[in-house]
């Protein structure tokens, strides 16, 4: 777009003036392209999943349990998801991280329900499925490509889905 043309002109000018090294400019350009690509991916995912989260929030109390850095509320607001959650349990705020089952106990407490009446939806077998089951929750495993060579027992989750919209036919 026009913004990209303007940015390229700025970079070219800075290189010509000796204020920016050509290699540094290429790295910066590449980093910007990677960031833009990641951002577009997030927007694509949100387009598919926001309606699901909205529908679930209209029928159920939703609490987010996440290993994050103290700014997840801002991120959720920026992407129009904040209002769907009745509570947020963020690891850096509560001082406990997944896979410690204690973070799921905090989520269950925030729900105000017995653990067996809580459905945890998670994408990590070792950090979501195992600790949530340890606490006594039901679990929907959003199974994607694995992060490593963790041992997996596919009988442990109550349901296995590969795309979030599938969850609507389960609940």
Question: Predicted regions: what is each one?
Answer:
Residues 25, 50, 54, 63-171:
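Asp-based, Mg2+/Mn2+-dependent phosphohydrolase catalytic module
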Residues 1-6:
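Short, small-residue-biased leader/transition segments that mark boundaries at the very start
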Residues 7-10, 68:
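Hydrophobic/aromatic residues within well-ordered alpha-helical segments
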Residues 13, 33, 37, 55, ...:
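Solvent-exposed, charged/polar functional surfaces in cytosolic regulatory/catalytic domains
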Residues 11-33:
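Conserved alpha/beta-hydrolase catalytic His-Asp/Glu region
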Residues 17, 37, 91-92:
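Alpha-helix C-capping/helix-to-loop hinge sites
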Residues 35-63:
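Short, acidic loop-to-helix structural element flanking the phosphoryl-transfer center
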């Amino acid at each position: 777009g026009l913004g990209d043309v303007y940015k390229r002109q700025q970079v070219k000018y800075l290189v010509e003036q000796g204020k920016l090294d050509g290699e540094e400019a290429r790295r910066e350009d590449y980093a910007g392209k990677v960031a833009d690509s990641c951002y577009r991916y997030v927007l694509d995912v949100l387009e598919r999943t926001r309606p699901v989260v909205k529908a679930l929030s209209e029928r159920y109390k939703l609490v987010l349990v996440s290993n994050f850095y103290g700014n997840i509320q801002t991120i959720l607001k920026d992407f129009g998801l904040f209002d769907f959650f009745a509570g947020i349990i963020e690891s850096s705020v509560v001082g406990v991280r997944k896979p410690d089952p204690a973070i799921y106990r905090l989520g269950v407490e925030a729900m105000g329900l017995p653990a067996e009446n809580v459905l945890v939806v998670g994408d990590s077998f070792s950090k979501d499925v195992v600790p949530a089951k340890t606490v006594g929750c039901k679990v929907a495993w959003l199974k994607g490509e694995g992060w490593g060579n963790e041992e997996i027992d596919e009988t442990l989750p109550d349901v296995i889905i590969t795309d979030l919209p599938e969850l609507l036919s389960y609940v």
